[in-house]
Amino acid sequence: MKAPLRALICQGIEALRSNGTLPTNTLPPDFVVERPKTRKHGDFATNVAMLLSKATGSNPRLLAQTLVAALPTSADIARIEIAGPGFINFHLHPVAYQRETINVLKQDNDYGRNLSGQSRTVGVEYVSANPTGPLHVGHGRAAAIGDCLARLLEANGWNVKREFYYNDAGVQIENLVRSVQARARGLKPGDAFWPTDAYNGEYIADIAKAYLAGDSINMVDTIITSTKNVDDTAAIHHFAVNYLRNEQNHDLAAFNVDFDIYFLESSLYKDGKVEETVQKLINSGHTYEEGGALWLKSTHFGDDKDRVMRKSDGSYTYFVPDIAYHLSKWQRGYERAITELGADHHGSLARVHAGLQALEIGIPPGWPEYVLHQMVTVMRGGEEVKLSKRSGGYVTLRDLIEETSTDATRWFLIARKPDSQLTFDIDLARQKSNDNPVFYVQYAYARVCSLMHQAHEKNLNYDQTSGMASLDQLSDNTSLCLMIEISRYPEIVQIACELLEPHLIAQYLRELAHAFHTWYHNTPVLVENAVERNAKLTLACATRQVLANGLNLLGVGTPEKM
């Protein structure tokens, strides 16, 4: 609903330019049209007069009055007020919200979507777990946030590529192989010859058992069969990594998360991309050798110190394949790249940005963008849950899904701003009460379904066309408040995408559900008067549609019965 007001204001500015009140070279400033915190200040407010006054040296309140007088007439605007130093407050007629409610039902699943992304390609990387163990709750938060970001970007007109980067190279993989080999040889944690830095979870025993049994793993494009040879570390490596990839994929599928691309870190070495990237950096003149090591002049690009790329023993530091990987994204045509990571990766961001800038191939500063999430604390019975027998040291994503549900787990892991620490209360997530936010929102959806079912059972035929034409019958405040809340949805979708903050969708849905439940408790719906009843059912159906659209962005279901 902001766009028509912005257009109206721009027309007013053009009128003042035409009559000489404003200089002809005065361009419409980057003004804000926003909803005030309280409706007593109007439905929308703008700071345009104050911005124009700075450019022209005019009194902002007087300029606001002049601009208001120049605005074209709009049937949607009931009155306009000047407030404070020059804010212009718009009070809308209820008809504007009634029309927006009708738009919801006309646009159906597309309501709230826009084309601002212009079909440009954006790569969204998330989860990207090491294939060394089960997915933990931190990976779950990354999956929920990343998947919701991808859905948000699609809703804003972007062509989204979902990507999972497997860190299947390095010391951690070597530790995995030694752990499985030790288990296959009959050793267990605590034994004298149990390897240092080995993984102790029960899942290692499961892998070893499957390996010794000669099991096969059915991956997407191949079948991997164990050789059962406990001395063949290459075979154990191949089997164990793919066993855990398969397990992680199983958990992600249960979490309704899928990817377009699975990228293996090992492929960067196999295809020579790491060496190629290092050579490009050497050729760019932004490296030097010291102490037998190769250094990147990362301080030239905003890092706090230069970084070692290749150690004196010839091995690469961990951020070098990260540069090669992100270079591959750029070469694949990603105009925009977003990487979702745990906050513990913060230290690597500057060096990756520095490496990409040092390539001098036109990658813009700040590419890729990063979304960092903080840790998750799991609580049950008022106490922190720290251990899982299967993982040997942390709560897994599978644990949460099995103890609560996919819907509850996704909601709770999205519900806070990514850079805020999150407490996952298992007891609350299992409650069927209004204290549980996902239940509260889904119950609003189910309530509308129940209303429609009751109407059918009572032979109260619903005429949507009549309902749309009769929304002006709903003159009470709770109905208007519900329509206003519905109308906010497209703005929230756009803002959440711009800020890369999917929790804003969850917050909005809770507020919409509250407005609906308030309306439901204060307004008899299935009344005798058919015109009034159709209008109320139309408002209820519009609410249900927005709830469905928003829950879909979160990857949360819409049960018709609770």
From Swiss-Prot:
Record-listed E.C. numbers: 6.1.1.19
Family to which the UniProt record says this protein belongs: Belongs to the class-I aminoacyl-tRNA synthetase family.
Enzyme class: ligase
Pfam entry (one): tRNA-synt_1d
UniProt-listed HAMAP family: Arg_tRNA_synth
GO BP annotations listed: arginyl-tRNA aminoacylation
UniProt KW keywords: Aminoacyl-tRNA synthetase, ATP-binding, Cytoplasm, Ligase, Nucleotide-binding, Protein biosynthesis
Protein name according to UniProt: Arginine--tRNA ligase
Protein origin, superkingdom: Bacteria
Catalytic activity: tRNA(Arg) + L-arginine + ATP = L-arginyl-tRNA(Arg) + AMP + diphosphate
Span(s) of short sequence motif 'HIGH' region: 129-139
Subunit structure: Monomer.
Gene3D superfamilies, per the entry: Arginyl tRNA synthetase N-terminal domain, HUPs, Isoleucyl-tRNA Synthetase, Domain 1
Location, primary (coarse class): cytoplasm
GO cellular component: cytoplasm
Single GO molecular function: arginine-tRNA ligase activity
Localization annotation: Cytoplasm
